[in-house]
């Protein structure tokens, strides 16, 4: 503003400076002259120039002559410099002192005229200058009536103000010498003030000064060069403000050039250096300011016309300069409508397809179209026209008044230049050609708009242009012999032109060429008839070619054609460059938008200041530090988890290796089968076959590979996980077995002979020895075979699922075979089959001896395997000797004995089966035998880790083994058989197949057994599992089986019992143990008559009082008026609506005999009217008139609307804050993204609503004629005027419809940018609250103690089946459901009591979890989703700007600045989104971990959202029961205190009154005072059927207190004189509750007894005094027992009520009475003791 105020100048600056009347006043006062104000202003200005001696010769020279301008405005015609006599002395009107110092201080002095008439005239001129006609007439009259002195004072003050203004202006003009001006112009660093001073100096300085500037300093050339430099600077700089200094400099330079040319010495310069002038001035024809264009137009007109008759060079130079403006960039207001803002944009050079003069005339036409709707008004005018005089110091009123005139002057100057250009053509052909070019450029349209201005001078110029055109056409007709009437040619009719040409070339040699040219033209255009764009392009090329040929002045036609073709090619190449430039413009415009956004962001940061920006950065750093710390914590946790996973991975590998080794052992045990023992040639051959050799070999390879992988993984993962002890031992043992097997393979068996055996053989006979040997061998073999048969028979009955072998014979699978024994058996069999040394021994005893030695070795190995829990029992049913095949080595007697033993074993097996079937008992396979196999099978086959089969204890007898038999030397050692019998697993008895389930157990048992087992279910969980195990459908194979299964299945569990009813209040709080509390009694009735001492009935309440007299008196006139029509007519009506007085009117029929009969209304109304009362009432009691809804104006009613009514109403409601703006202004505010639009959330939300942005087909069809397509390169005007639409429709059209291709993305982006910071703060706050809650729960020191107490007490209460290691949080809500035996206390009450009394430190958990209360109002899942949606929205906006709807700026509305608002904030928003996502992920991870820590499922959304609320609900319930417990304990404490207080004086009284022999009885009575009293009160209580009113109870209590007070008035020293008072106060102030809540059972019984006494008294009609003697009724022997009991009950009942209802004063009074009663009781005791 300061620069604008300082640097703005225009053509009228001097005249405006002296436009006030003070100059004329000064002139008239001093010279009595009638000079104009303008000349006086110049005189005063010239007198000031003496103060600057640098550019002056002497003062007399300046006084003798000066320069003046006849028309100060440069727009006025005939503006020229001339010498005039000033006719004024410098020293007379204004006293000045010469000084060489600048600035100069001068004194102001104005001489007063002697004539009063002169002062009067000067004063009237002053009033005219002040526009006194706008003042009120009264003020004007007062000013005219001022005295002469006051008028002169006002004149002098105005003159002094004008003088000071001139002085300030003179000081602002830094006048330099010509050389100094030349120096600053050459340096191109001249300021606006200096250029303005140069322009003033060229007008006011003497001719010598101007000559020095022009000839000596080449000032005109410097000005032209500087003007060119300014034009280049405008293009290079991104100037958007029309009021920039650079435009002021351009105006000042053109004004200076015009001043130079206005003098002859300057005008002569254009003859020599016209090129510099023309090129500089022609560029100003495209200036955004009208004043600049007008000056440039006048200058060019002068250059062509000045002595141009003999110099056509300047004329052609001007034409070439006009042709070159198409190649120059320009600045203009970039908006397709008339309500664009004051924002400039740089336009690139126009393409070569623009016609000659087209760009220049387009600028003129645009200026005319931008004028206002009304004459001399800027309403509807564009900023281009409004800013025509930007930089001037004229007043706004002056500029507005001259706006239309200066636009007309610009049009006149333009039309004059056109006429000069056309008129200076060499001949009529050139002139006709120039006119054709002007018409092609749009001159006809401009002339039509010029005529609409209605200016006479402009109309004359247009008429002159048309006359010259007609003259040239006539000359053309004359020269071409077209002047005959038959050959009249119309140059605007193409058909007439072609006919004329055809007539001229017909029957000549040119006929063929003409016809061929027309035919080719027709054929060329006929092919492109369907494509108007191509047709236009081809015709343009053809016209350009013909035009270039016709414009070339040369004799050679070939040269003309070549020149035309070259120009055409140049133009076409320029078109390609232009298209490429357009693509570049899109890119650079985007870059410019981003740069502008960055600049604005930097400006915003700078505006924040150092402190603000540092604080912002510190906040960002804190947030990042917090996120980094959390990531570090997560990283540490992940490292720990990774280490754990590595360890777990290695342990799983070890487990897998262990399982494979165990599986290999089982396979090896199960594969040994003695398939055949053949006797061949006295040799024994044992063949052992396996069915899983390949699987075993593969397992061995896998074991070795796993061991190698294990070592490799340890090295790669950097872990050192040692194998388990079992795996290590198994590895070592298997290695030992392999080594020993290799040793056995390499052993050379030799003949072995025992010395003792040899001796026995020598002593005995050969027959006996042979018999003994055979017998011993038979017995040993039979024993071995019997043991093996028994084992095989037992193992056959064990149901073991087979291994899934894809092929091969079906075989049983065993998992507890004797690993080492079977393995070595296999090795021995292989050795025996392969060794020739063994096969040569035919002696059975020798074979058995070798076998015995091997088995002894196996025994040693088995002892080493005892610590590894390996069962060496043989379970293969096929692993037995085939005695038929071994017949060659066994005697017949042994075979027979073996068969007998086998038959006996078969009988025993059948007997055992029958017994087992009768007992219906089962025994499942041994867990040790099944554990390894089932674990492997469940893991790799069934997909399970562990399946535990129930263990059922069977009482069936087991098969007894044989005793060890004595053997000979050749038999096996009995120790081996003993050990073998102990180690081989004994099979269970065989069960009936129909009675087995899938686990090998019975399907069911008898109902008795089931019931018996149900009884013992709490002691054995395994039995429950067996009874409730599901039965597979695959096991039911027959109807019988199915029936038995159905009938004998375990019954389903009984349904759960219904939930218990809500617990009643405990007795101490007024609850009842037997039933619910009775409803509260009705309110008490009024006291009966006999208690009031009168038999009269209480009178009813009096009626409402009548209205006040004051109100009635005020309502007199209106009432009478309404009752009488004539009186109503006489009362004047108010001018505006008043507040209504609401009263109860008296009917007209009741007025006759009433107070209101014949009131004196007429006189009173007249009196009130005369006194102004009614007027005052209108001011005081004016009613607020309801605002009328804004009705549509007449022009709005005539407008069109297409929107639905509800949509239009939404526009009106949401945009009501912008009703003061017009439609165009509001649309521009939205497009410019003004702050008041962006800060209004209702507007942004409304713009983004789906029903607003979704355009239906009907709306699209209706709005299409009014729409503007901004997606095309050239924006065309709509078919219909959008002003015909109503306001909502117009806004909808301009925003939602015209911008529908990117409106949704635009609105979404603005919403994100505006709200991202606020949303971020909100989400971070919620996340941090969640973090605090999670940390408080996780780090709580006392919460775990509370839960452990609950768990311990609960486990103590539950039976063994419901024992728990922990409980879920949902169980906390059930703690208050379980109540005690009397329903007076819940489990939570007891837990709180235990914690408060035994573990008070645990109560701190409430404070530790206090921060959880804030989280309960939030949904955890919604917060997480909101954070993700926040980041997703910002990402979508970035995508829209990169590759989406917001990526192409060329498709935006020209005034849209959405990127300028979005781009600066987007990087920060992206950073915020990343930080928010990181914090949300961390928070959710911690929250999920906490849920897992408490055994909850984090994937369940309902559980997740209610997780924190479970803690808060528990705390609320805990606080509630804590308050209830404390309240109950306080009541009990008060009760105990009162009880002790009552018992103490009673014991002393009883000791005084009773004899010594009754001491025992009195002591007993002292201990049972309360009990006896309660018994008596119960006996006096009414029956259940009797109902007593609470009102009666209260009344009786009151009467009892009154009677006691009367009775105890005389005996103050009695112990009972205090209790009634205390009771009275308790009744009156405290005990007003009729319900039983909070009262004890003793209180209720006392109430019942009182009610019974009241009924008795009412029936007997006794006086109140009888009722008061409560002691006589209750206990005649002890008169104070009833009063004491009553007082006790009152105090108990009022203990908790008084705290809430009594005031401080009443509470203090009650405490004082209590102390008094205690003191009185103590005094009584002391008296009694003294009397004794």
Curated annotation (Swiss-Prot):
Residues 52-73, 992-1009, 1029-1049, 1547-1557, 1609-1629 have a biased composition (Polar residues). It is found in: Cytoplasm, Cytoskeleton; Bud neck; Bud tip; Cell septum. Residues 780-796 have a biased composition (Acidic residues). Residues 765-778, 1010-1026, 1653-1663, 1693-1711 have a biased composition (Basic and acidic residues). Keywords: Actin-binding, Cell cycle, Cell division, Coiled coil, Cytoplasm, Cytoskeleton, Virulence. Disruption phenotype: Leads to swollen cells, increased random budding pattern, and severe defect in cytokinesis with enlarged bud necks. Residues 111-557 form the GBD/FH3 domain. Residues 12-51, 1109-1118 have a biased composition (Low complexity). It holds the Pfam family Drf_FH3. Residues 1563-1595 form the DAD domain. This is Formin BNI1. The gene is BNI1.
């Amino acid at each position: 503003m300061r620069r604008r105020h300082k640097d703005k100048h225009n053509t009228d600056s001097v005249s405006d400076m002296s436009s006030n009347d003070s100059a004329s006043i000064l002139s008239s006062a001093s010279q009595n002259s009638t000079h104009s104000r303008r000349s006086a202003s110049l005189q005063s200005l010239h007198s000031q120039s003496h103060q600057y001696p640098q550019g002056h010769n002497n003062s007399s020279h300046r006084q003798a002559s000066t320069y003046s301008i006849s028309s100060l405005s440069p727009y006025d015609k005939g503006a020229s410099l001339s010498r005039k006599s000033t006719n004024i002395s410098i020293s007379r009107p204004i006293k000045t002192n010469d000084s060489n110092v600048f600035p100069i201080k001068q004194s102001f002095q104005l001489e007063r005229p002697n004539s009063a008439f002169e002062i009067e005239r000067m004063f009237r001129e002053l009033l005219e200058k002040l526009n006194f006609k706008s003042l009120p007439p009264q003020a004007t009259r007062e000013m005219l009536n001022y005295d002469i002195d006051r008028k002169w004072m006002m004149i002098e003050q105005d003159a002094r103000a004008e003088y000071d203004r001139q002085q300030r202006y003179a000081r602002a003009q830094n006048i330099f010498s010509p050389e100094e001006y030349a120096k600053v112009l050459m340096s191109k660093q001249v300021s606006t003030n200096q250029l303005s001073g140069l322009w003033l100096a060229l007008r006011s300085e003497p001719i010598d000064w101007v000559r020095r500037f022009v000839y000596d300093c080449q000032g005109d050339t410097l000005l032209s060069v500087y003007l060119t430099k300014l034009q280049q600077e405008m293009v290079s700089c991104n100037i958007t403000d029309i009021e920039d200094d650079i435009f002021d400099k351009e105006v000042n330079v053109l004004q200076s050039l015009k001043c130079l040319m206005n003098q002859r010495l300057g005008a002569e310069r254009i003859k020599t250096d016209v090129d510099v002038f023309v090129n500089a001035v022609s560029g100003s024809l495209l200036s955004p300011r009208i004043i600049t264009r007008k000056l440039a137009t006048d200058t060019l007109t002068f250059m062509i016309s000045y002595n141009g008759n003999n110099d056509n060079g300047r004329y052609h130079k001007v034409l070439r300069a006009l042709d070159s403006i198409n190649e120059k960039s320009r600045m203009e207001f970039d908006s397709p409508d008339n309500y664009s803002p004051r924002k400039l944009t740089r336009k690139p050079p126009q393409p070569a397809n623009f016609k000659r003069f087209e760009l220049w005339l387009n600028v003129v036409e645009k200026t005319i179209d931008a004028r206002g709707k009304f004459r001399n008004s800027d309403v509807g005018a564009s900023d281009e026209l409004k800013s025509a005089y930007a930089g001037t110091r004229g007043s706004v009123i002056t500029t507005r008044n001259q706006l239309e005139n200066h636009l007309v002057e610009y049009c006149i100057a333009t039309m004059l230049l056109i006429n000069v250009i056309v008129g200076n053509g060499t001949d009529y052909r050139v002139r006709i050609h120039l006119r054709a070019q002007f018409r092609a450029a749009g001159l006809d349209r401009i002339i039509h708009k010029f005529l609409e201005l209605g200016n006479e001078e402009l109309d004359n110029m247009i008429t002159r242009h048309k006359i010259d055109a007609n003259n040239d056409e006539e000359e053309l007709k004359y020269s071409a012999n077209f002047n005959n009437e038959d050959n009249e040619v119309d140059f605007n009719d193409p058909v007439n032109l072609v006919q004329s040409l055809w007539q001229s070339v017909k029957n000549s040699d040119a006929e063929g060429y003409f016809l061929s040219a027309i035919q080719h033209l027709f054929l060329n255009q006929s092919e492109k008839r369907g494509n108007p764009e191509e047709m236009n392009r081809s015709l343009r090329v053809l016209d350009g070619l013909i035009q270039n040929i016709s414009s070339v002045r040369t004799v050679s036609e070939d040269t003309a054609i070549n020149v035309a073709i070259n120009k055409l090619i140049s133009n076409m190449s320029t078109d390609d460059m232009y298209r490429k430039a357009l693509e570049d413009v899109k890119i650079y415009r985007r870059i410019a938008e981003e740069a502008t956004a960055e600049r604005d962001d930097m400006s915003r940061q700078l505006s924040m200041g150092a402190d603000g920006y540092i604080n912002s950065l510190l906040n960002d750093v804190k947030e990042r530090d917090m996120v980094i710390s959390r990531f570090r914590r997560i990283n540490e946790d992940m490292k720990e988890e990774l280490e754990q996973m590595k360890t777990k991975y290695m342990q799983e590998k070890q487990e897998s290796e262990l399982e494979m080794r165990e599986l290999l052992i089982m396979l090896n045990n199960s594969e040994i089968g003695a398939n055949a023992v053949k006797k061949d040639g006295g040799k024994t051959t044992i063949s052992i076959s396996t069915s899983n050799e390949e699987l075993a070999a593969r397992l061995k390879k896998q074991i070795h590979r796993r061991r190698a992988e294990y070592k490799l993984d340890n090295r790669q993962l950097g872990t050192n996980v040692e194998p388990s002890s079992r795996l290590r031992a198994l590895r070592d043992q298997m290695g030992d077995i392999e080594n020993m097997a290799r040793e056995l393979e390499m052993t050379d068996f030799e003949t072995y002979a025992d010395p003792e055996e040899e001796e026995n053989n020598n002593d005995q006979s050969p027959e006996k020895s042979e018999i003994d040997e055979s017998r011993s061998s038979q017995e040993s073999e039979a024993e071995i075979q019997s043991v093996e048969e028994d084992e095989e028979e037992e193992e056959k009955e064990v149901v073991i699922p087979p291994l899934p072998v894809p092929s091969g014979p079906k075989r049983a699978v065993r998992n507890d075979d004797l690993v080492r024994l079977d393995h070595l058996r296999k090795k021995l069999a292989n050795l025996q089959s392969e060794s020739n040394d063994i096969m040569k021994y035919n002696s059975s005893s020798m074979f058995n001896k070798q076998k015995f030695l091997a088995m002894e070795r196996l025994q040693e190995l088995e002892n080493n395997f005892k610590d590894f829990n390996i069962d060496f029992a043989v379970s293969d049913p096929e692993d037995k000797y085939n005695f038929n095949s071994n017949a060659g080595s066994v005697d017949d007697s042994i075979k027979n004995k073996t068969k007998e033993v086998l038959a006996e074993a078969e009988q025993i097996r059948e007997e055992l089966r029958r017994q087992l079937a009768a007992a219906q008992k089962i025994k499942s396979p041994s867990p040790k035998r099944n554990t390894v196999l089932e674990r492997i099978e469940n893991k790799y086959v069934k997909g399970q880790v562990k399946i535990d089969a129930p263990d059922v204890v069977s009482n069936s007898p087991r098969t007894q083994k044989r005793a060890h038999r004595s053997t000979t030397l050749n038999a096996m050692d009995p120790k081996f058989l003993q050990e073998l019998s102990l180690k081989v697993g004994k099979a269970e008895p065989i069960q009936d197949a129909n009675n087995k389930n899938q686990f090998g157990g019975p399907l069911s048992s008898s109902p008795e057994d089931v019931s018996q087992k149900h009884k013992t279910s709490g002691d054995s969980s395994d039995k429950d599992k067996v009874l409730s195990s599901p039965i597979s459908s695959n096991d039911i194979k027959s109807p019988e089986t199915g029936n038995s299964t159905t009938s004998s299945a375990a019954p389903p569990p009984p349904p759960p019992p219904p939930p218990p009813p809500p617990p009643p209040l405990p007795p101490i709080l007024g609850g009842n143990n037997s039933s619910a509390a009775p409803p509260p009694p009705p309110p008490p009735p009024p006291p009966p008559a006999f208690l009031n001492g009168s038999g009269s009935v209480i009178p009813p309440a009096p009626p409402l009082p009548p209205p006040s007299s004051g109100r009635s008196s005020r309502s007199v006139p209106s009432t009478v008026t309404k009752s009488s029509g004539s009186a109503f007519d006489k009362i004047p009506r108010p001018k505006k609506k008043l507040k209504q007085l609401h009263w109860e009117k008296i009917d007209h029929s009741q007025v006759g005999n009433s107070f209101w009969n014949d009131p004196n209304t007429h006189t009173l109304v007249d009196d009130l009217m005369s006194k102004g009362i009614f007027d005052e009432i209108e001011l005081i009691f004016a009613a607020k008139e309801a605002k009328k809804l804004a009705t549509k104006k007449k022009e709005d009613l005539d407008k069109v609307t297409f929107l639905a009514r509800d949509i239009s109403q939404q526009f009106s409601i949401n945009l009501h804050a912008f009703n003061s703006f017009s439609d165009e202004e509001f649309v521009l505010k939205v497009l410019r993204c003004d702050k008041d639009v962006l800060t209004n959330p209702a507007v942004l939300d409304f713009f983004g609503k789906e029903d607003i942005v979704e355009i239906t087909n009907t709306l699209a069809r209706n709005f299409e004629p009014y729409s503007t397509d901004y997606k095309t390169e050239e924006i065309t005007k709509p078919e219909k005027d959008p002003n015909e639409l109503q306001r909502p429709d117009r806004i909808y059209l301009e925003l939602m419809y015209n911008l529908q291709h990117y409106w949704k993305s635009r609105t979404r982006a603005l919403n994100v940018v505006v709200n991202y910071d606020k949303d971020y703060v909100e989400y971070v706050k919620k996340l941090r609250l969640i973090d605090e809650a999670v940390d408080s729960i996780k780090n709580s020191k006392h919460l775990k103690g509370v839960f452990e107490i609950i768990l311990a007490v609960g486990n103590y209460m539950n039976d063994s089946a419901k024992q728990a290691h922990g409980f879920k949080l949902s169980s906390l809500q059930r703690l208050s459901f379980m109540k005690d035996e009397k329903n007076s206390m819940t489990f939570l009450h007891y837990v709180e009591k235990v914690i408060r009394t035994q573990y008070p430190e645990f109560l701190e958990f409430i404070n530790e979890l206090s921060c959880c209360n804030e989280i309960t109002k939030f949904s955890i899942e919604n917060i997480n989703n909101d954070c993700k949606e926040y980041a997703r929205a910002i990402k979508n906006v970035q995508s829209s700007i990169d590759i989406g709807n917001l990526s192409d700026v060329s498709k935006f509305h020209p005034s849209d600045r959405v990127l300028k608002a979005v781009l600066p904030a987007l990087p920060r928003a992206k950073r915020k989104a990343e930080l928010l996502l990181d914090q949300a992920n961390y928070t959710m991870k911690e929250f999920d971990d906490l849920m897992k820590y408490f055994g909850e499922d984090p994937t369940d959304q309902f559980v997740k959202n209610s997780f924190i609320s479970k803690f808060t609900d528990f705390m609320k319930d805990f606080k509630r029961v804590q308050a209830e417990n404390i309240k109950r304990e306080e009541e009990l404490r008060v009760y105990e205190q009162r009880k002790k207080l009552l018992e103490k004086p009673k014991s002393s009284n009883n000791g005084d009154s009773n004899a010594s022999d009754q001491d025992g009885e009195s002591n007993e009575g002292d201990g049972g005072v309360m009990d006896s009293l309660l018994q008596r009160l119960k006996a006096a209580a009414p029956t259940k059927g009797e109902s007593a009113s609470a009102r009666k109870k209260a009344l009786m209590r009151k009467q009892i207190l009154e009677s006691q007070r009367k009775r105890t008035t005389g005996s103050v020293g009695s112990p009972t004189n205090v209790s009634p008072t205390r009771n009275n106060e308790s009744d009156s102030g405290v005990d007003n509750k009729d319900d039983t809540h909070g009262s004890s059972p003793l209180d209720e019984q006392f109430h019942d007894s009182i009610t019974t006494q009241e009924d008795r008294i009412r029936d007997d009609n006794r006086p109140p005094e009888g009722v008061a003697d409560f002691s006589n009724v209750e206990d005649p022997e002890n008169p104070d027992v009833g009063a004491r009991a009553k007082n006790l009950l009152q105090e108990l009942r009022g203990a908790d009520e008084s705290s809430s209802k009594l005031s401080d004063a009443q509470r203090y009074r009650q405490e004082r009475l209590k102390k008094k009663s205690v003191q009185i009781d103590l005094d009584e005791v002391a008296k009694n003791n003294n009397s004794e």
